[in-house]
Amino acid sequence: MRDGTPRANRLWGRLLVEELLRCGVGLFCVAPGSRSTPLVAAIAEHPRARALVHYDERGTAFAALGYARATGRPAAWVTTSGTAVANGLPAVAEAATDCVPMLLLTADRPPELRHTGANQTIEQPGIFGGYARWSFDVPPPGPDQDPATVLTTVDQAVYRSQRPPAGPVHLNLMFREPFLPQPAQPDGLPDLWPGDGPYTRYARAAPVPDEAEVRELASALGAAERGVVVAGRLRSRKQGEAAARLAAALGWPLLPDICSQARLGARPEVSAPYHDLLLAGGRFPGGRAPDAVVRVGGVPVSKRLQRYVTGRKPATYAVVADHPFRSDPEHLATHRLEADVAELCAALAGRVRRAAAPGWLSGWLRASGEAGRRLEAALRERKGLSEPGVARLVSRLIPEDHALVAASSMPVRDLDTFADPEGPPVPVAANRGASGIDGTVATAAGFARGAGRPVTLLIGDLALLHDLNSLAMLRGLPAVVVVLNNDGGGIFHFLPVAEHGGIFEPYFGTPHGLGFRQAAEMFGLGYSGPRTAGELSLAYQRACAEGGPHLIEVVTDRRENLALHRELLRGAAG
């Protein structure tokens, strides 16, 4: 059997790659390794296979995640055996938590080498636990195996990664040595396909709520005088627009999260984009909490918004999402509807009657506009650069053809609170499923490739240090990295632990004393270090126009940042 092993490996690898391409997989994120040779060779030799090769498995996994965030389709993460596989867990956890499709193709030793002490062998089947939507341990290629089993396994994997709830799917692929035959013209593939598409065509599944449930919810919403529509994390501008139309039909304000695809380019006739500023003052338009809430999409970034909509249990609290998970940390939901978000919002908008209290919507819009004007005036009075000011400037100046990726921690929060709603309606992405700071640069690299757009990344210094080697994936991309370097963990200054001076700075503030000029030079990025808002505007616009990867470093002070946030929130709240 060993005489036929190299040819069987080559055939298996080529069948896998061909079928993945037929299923619409548009990117292979590859980390070099030996055991995955049959797969990698097939990717390299296929004229339609598009590959991103990077030397860090954690980075390539996050790049696959970013690609899927942009496209809604899975990329294939390809890795060798051993601890290389374990490096995918952070991205897998994020993808599973936020229902992002992902294909995990991990090479492994054959059965006779497991649990023997063989080199670079760990327990790979089941390694991703409950985060994998489906896992399959694929046996080694052999002459007695039907090649069609490869195709149907791939088809099932791609389908399971995208059907609700979307998420990671793991194919653990065993290969025996030798991995490839001697270099020669490869044999043609067997004639297994009836046409140009995949071997097995899966019809797309989409949950459809019961019509009676939709009517009942529409009736409950129509009876509420003071309601709000909260647009949480959404996957497309179409979904954000559908949420806005539902709010308009109800006569309620839309409170959009930065990742709702409705916060930038907000619709002024229905959107209250500065809701976080308003709620910071503890005063609500209309003087009371809502009696009905529709949350569309994921849990929003703003804790103040969450406290507002849940502080007094609403009579109706509906959660609409395209997955079956609970998504209700306060345990207040009265209605939970799983469906295509845009379609369900349209269905509700066509059935509700408008019973909003007079002045409810206009009060929200007026208060939000006033908060925005106070914020603008306060930031204009400041001469130096600040983290809120940088977030606002980027949201205003980002070109319409860009995408915006925000790191978790302070950047996504500052964009949520301070972004200019009149900025271009660009796609916005952040890893807010599990909300880790790891893999942010790699996510942006994958997102840019998936969206087919230049990308602007707003990131903090610790998140950039955490994923520094992923800057290599930005080579050749029109990418602008804006890093806010406050020499440590700025977000911890907003938490009660900041009062514990003896332990705070060494264990939470964690100053590092590092700058990023040399990192930009090492990875081939242009560099700017602006000190004023004017310099930042020029540097950012120049970097966007030049098109190559560029890093802009803005140095700030953590304590000053805390004081400024408090000042802006007090002032904008009125």
From Swiss-Prot:
It is an enzyme of class 2 (transferase). One of its GO terms (biological process) is menaquinone biosynthetic process. Catalyzes the thiamine diphosphate-dependent decarboxylation of 2-oxoglutarate and the subsequent addition of the resulting succinic semialdehyde-thiamine pyrophosphate anion to isochorismate to yield 2-succinyl-5-enolpyruvyl-6-hydroxy-3-cyclohexene-1-carboxylate (SEPHCHC). Its cofactor is Mg(2+); Mn(2+); thiamine diphosphate. Pathway: Quinol/quinone metabolism; 1,4-dihydroxy-2-naphthoate biosynthesis; 1,4-dihydroxy-2-naphthoate from chorismate: step 2/7; Quinol/quinone metabolism; menaquinone biosynthesis. Its EC number is 2.2.1.9. Homodimer. It catalyses: isochorismate + 2-oxoglutarate + H(+) = 5-enolpyruvoyl-6-hydroxy-2-succinyl-cyclohex-3-ene-1-carboxylate + CO2. Keywords: Magnesium, Manganese, Menaquinone biosynthesis, Metal-binding, Thiamine pyrophosphate, Transferase. GO terms for molecular function: 2-succinyl-5-enolpyruvyl-6-hydroxy-3-cyclohexene-1-carboxylic-acid synthase activity; magnesium ion binding; manganese ion binding; thiamine pyrophosphate binding. The keyword Transmembrane does not apply. Belongs to the TPP enzyme family. MenD subfamily. Binds 1 thiamine pyrophosphate per subunit. This is 2-succinyl-5-enolpyruvyl-6-hydroxy-3-cyclohexene-1-carboxylate synthase. Pfam families: TPP_enzyme_C, TPP_enzyme_M_2, TPP_enzyme_N.
